[in-house]
UniProtKB/Swiss-Prot annotation:
Gene3D superfamilies (alphabetical): Glucose-6-phosphate isomerase like protein, domain 1, Helix hairpin bin
GO cellular component, one term: cytosolic small ribosomal subunit
Protein name listed in UniProt: Small ribosomal subunit protein uS2
Organism domain of life: Bacteria
The entry's keywords: Ribonucleoprotein, Ribosomal protein
UniProt cross-references to SUPFAM superfamilies, sorted A to Z: Ribosomal protein S2
CDD domains in the cross-refs: RPS2 (cd01425)
PANTHER family reported for this sequence: 30S RIBOSOMAL PROTEIN S2 PROKARYOTIC AND ORGANELLAR (PTHR12534), SMALL RIBOSOMAL SUBUNIT PROTEIN US2M (PTHR12534:SF0)
Native organism: Geobacillus stearothermophilus (Bacillus stearothermophilus)
A GO term, aspect molecular function: structural constituent of ribosome
Encoding gene, per UniProt annotation: rpsB
UniProt-listed InterPro entries: Ribosomal_uS2 (IPR001865), Ribosomal_uS2_bac/mit/plastid (IPR005706), Ribosomal_uS2_CS (IPR018130), Ribosomal_uS2_flav_dom_sf (IPR023591)
Similarity-based family: Belongs to the universal ribosomal protein uS2 family.
Any GO BP annotation: translation
Amino acid sequence: MSVISMKQLLEAGVHFGWQTRRWNPKMKKYIFTERNGIYLIDIQKTVKKVEEAYNFVRELAANGGKILFVGTKRQAQESVKEEAERCGMFYVNQRRIGGTLTNFATLQKRIKRLREIEKMEEDGVFDVLPKKEVIGLKKEKERLEKFIGGIKDMKELPDALFVIDPRKERIAVAEARKLNIPIIGIVDTNNDPCEGGYVIPANDDAIRAVKLLTSKIADAVLEAKQGEEAAVAAE
């Protein structure tokens, strides 16, 4: 049984690519046809590529691997957060701070600062500080939570990146490639398929399409975890 059906892909609008004048020729093999000035993606290939990515993620998660979901465009922000949280993985869904992967020590300092402020609030320190200082600390906490809240529990580099629109997230992709971290990318017809290790040719601008594909990656993680739990129970 397939991980995903062509019917699901069609209903979510996964097959709609970009205007023909804004395409990347490297995506030619994933294009089915052109209609009214828009390229339509060959979703038979999308089905196959989703299965490949699903199997890779399931195997990775079964071996304790961690995945970082990345999607900062408006259409992806909600799905990235919801699905990463659903499967217990990390995410970045706001404007990325350069060096998140390549300068991991700096990221850890930011996480440490967020933890410090959270502890101050929990311990009642805010109650004895001047109001102006408390306001400043709360603003700092909100900003840190917004940008690194999804990775504050990430104690080491992820084992793979799942990226919506590698073209937009080119900094994250470049950092991952530099560190030899595998990439799974939802790649539209205006993208470079070489930028994603596991390419999923699909519409990366439709909220329903992004949600569907992101949920499948989360499902792969959950299937691996369920298998792990079943194995432990059997022992």
